[in-house]
Amino acid sequence: MNVGTRFFVSLVAALAALTANPQSPPPSALINQESEETVEAARSASPHTSESTYAYFREEAETFLAEATQRIWDPDAPREPSPRTAWGDPDLSGYWLNVAYVPLERPVELAEKPLYSEEEAITAFVRWATQDASVDPATVHYDWTEFGMDNWQSPVRPNLRTSLIVDPPNGRVPPLTPEGLVRLEQQARRHTLESRGLYERCIQGNQGPPRVPFLQNTGQSQIFQTPEAVILITQSNSDVRILHLDSSPHAPQSVRSWLGDSRARWEGDTLVVATTNFHHGRKWDGSAGDLHLEERLTRVARDTLLYEATMTDPTTWETPWSVEVPWPMMDPPGLFEFACHEQNYGIINVLRGARVRAAEYEAAQREASGTE
């Protein structure tokens, strides 16, 4: 019995034990200590019946893990030659998914271990995927599960890497500069509409740039090409990036945008994208308008793009740092409409809560300094 089969068998046993009794409460009820009445009310609002909920969870999760554990992402594996467009450029076109069950930063206890063994990679993958899939689809939720868009329903597969960060060698975000630390603390104090995040305000999606996987599975994107440009569309907020290939210079520093100003070129089979001129109001991990981003996209297999990104901002981090994320091809392909502003009345309560927290923080600071 190979490694993948052995872990899959143990997983099936765990899932079967969890879902064998249709009278027992669903996992979310156990986690959240919800009442039986609340769970039943949630089920009645779902297209799944009580019985089909358990079958749905068990059968789809088992199928997903059976398929996923047959292919493991190995960064050192040989790469396939890239297919070509009609005009001879590497063909990156298609629908791709930016998703991973790998942490951005390497756990401290794995600081000297950049790669898992296959057995360890499958163990980590099964742990994260099982936890993700254990959210009962009969409870009230967004439409991710109904439309097959949760991470555990995607073509994501185990990864030998122990972190998405590949440089520095310890797999951790470099220390912030004093200026970056102050900026990050200021960004955390969000008590006005303009200081809230762009994603929260429906101005920009959660897919960067840079394209670091987000908690929600909104990493769906489409790439199409012309001889003059590569166009990248993300489902999240319907963001569009036009990556010009004409060797023109970047826009003047006074011209800035939320997605930055990008210029692209081909290096062999790899598309290299340099992006500068980010809007100073854009906030990303403490960085703002001084971020210089280099992204690299390579089609390493028929159904896989390799995304690499290096972030440089001397005003924020002590050194540059880089991530690597394999993008599986979406199956089935296609993007959904991303409606955001239409139901964003919750921002009022968010702002109210932020102002209360800010007032409490300022009062505590005054008390600590003896000025109150």
Regions found by a protein language model. Give the residues of each.
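Bacterial N-terminal signal peptides
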Residues: 9-19
